[in-house]
């Protein structure tokens, strides 16, 4: 649990670190759209190389990105196997009972697997190179035009910032509670599935109690400092869009055009 990557920021001075957080969020949105354009091995090879190049530019060890994938591995495998065994379209390559592996199912399976890996890797890159406060400011800035439609841009940004900030804290609390339970003789690895699920209850109850206490303390602290929402607030740190941010957006749009060409 203490190795969960999401919500953690690694201090650095790489090209990716210096990008405006708004350009990173826009790039991620375009990146996700581009990934769903890819539909053959060549397009996925191109986007994988592009992602590895971004990892290289970030100057962050590859192990951190593998750490971002690890908590999601069971969901990735389940989604992949579901496509492989339950997609009945196309020529049947192998079958046993209700399970069939078809050409289309196998093709969809490996594409879904890579989509998960690539999207999680880019999301991990975003959180590792951008502070939660910067992400919050970026979301608020991008949503500000929607305030004319009564969209609470500041509140959405604040919720994102608090969520990212408290994920590592909750994981640390979970690790601490599990270690305390193990010291009392609890073995989380023994027994059948039902017994393992039951063993989680002694973790959830104190974790919820700790979460409510932290939320209450945070609310009191914000009120004590005179927090009243976005009205009349100014910012000490201002976001600055420059040439490298424009080039980054152009680069990922160029990637999309390349994939669109290779796809057709």
From Swiss-Prot:
Protein keywords: Cell membrane, Membrane, Transmembrane, Transmembrane helix, Transport
GO MF, any single term: riboflavin transmembrane transporter activity
Family matches, as Pfam families: CbiQ
Gene name linked to the record: ecfT
UniProt GO BP: riboflavin transport
Protein name: Energy-coupling factor transporter transmembrane protein EcfT
UniProt lineage: Bacteria, Bacillati, Bacillota, Bacilli, Lactobacillales
Subunit structure as annotated in this protein's UniProt entry: Forms a stable energy-coupling factor (ECF) transporter complex composed of 2 membrane-embedded substrate-binding proteins (S component), 2 ATP-binding proteins (A component) and 2 transmembrane proteins (T component) upon coexpression of the components in E.coli. May be able to interact with more than 1 S component at a time.
Native species: Streptococcus thermophilus (strain ATCC BAA-250 / LMG 18311)
Function: Transmembrane (T) component of an energy-coupling factor (ECF) ABC-transporter complex. Unlike classic ABC transporters this ECF transporter provides the energy necessary to transport a number of different substrates. Expression of the complex plus RibU in de-energized E.coli allows riboflavin uptake.
């Amino acid at each position: 649990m203490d190795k969960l990557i999401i919500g953690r920021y690694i201090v650095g001075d790489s090209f990716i670190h210096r990008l405006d957080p708004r350009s990173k969020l826009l790039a991620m949105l375009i990146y996700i759209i581009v990934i769903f354009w890819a539909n053959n091995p060549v397009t996925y090879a191109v986007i994988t190389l592009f992602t590895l190049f971004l990892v290289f530019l970030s100057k962050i060890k590859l192990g951190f990105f593998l750490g971002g994938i690890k908590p999601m591995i069971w969901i990735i495998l389940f989604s992949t196997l579901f496509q492989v065994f339950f997609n009945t379209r196309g020529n049947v390559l192998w079958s046993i009972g209700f399970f069939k592996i078809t050409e289309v199912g196998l093709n969809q399976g490996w594409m879904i697997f890579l989509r998960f890996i690539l999207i999680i890797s880019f999301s991990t890159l975003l959180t590792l190179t951008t502070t939660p406060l910067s992400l919050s400011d970026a979301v608020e800035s991008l949503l500000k035009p929607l305030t004319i439609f009564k969209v609470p841009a500041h509140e959405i940004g604040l919720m994102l910032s608090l969520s990212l900030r408290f994920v590592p804290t909750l994981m640390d609390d979970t690790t601490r509670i599990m270690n305390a339970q193990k010291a009392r003789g609890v073995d989380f690895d023994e027994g059948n599935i039902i017994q393992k699920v039951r063993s989680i209850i002694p973790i959830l109850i104190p974790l919820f109690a700790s979460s409510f206490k932290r939320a209450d303390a945070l609310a009191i602290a914000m009120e004590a400092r005179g927090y009243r929402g976005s009205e009349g607030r100014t910012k000490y740190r201002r976001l600055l869009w420059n040439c490298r941010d424009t080039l980054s957006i152009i680069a990922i749009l160029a990637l999309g055009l390349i994939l669109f060409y290779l796809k057709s």
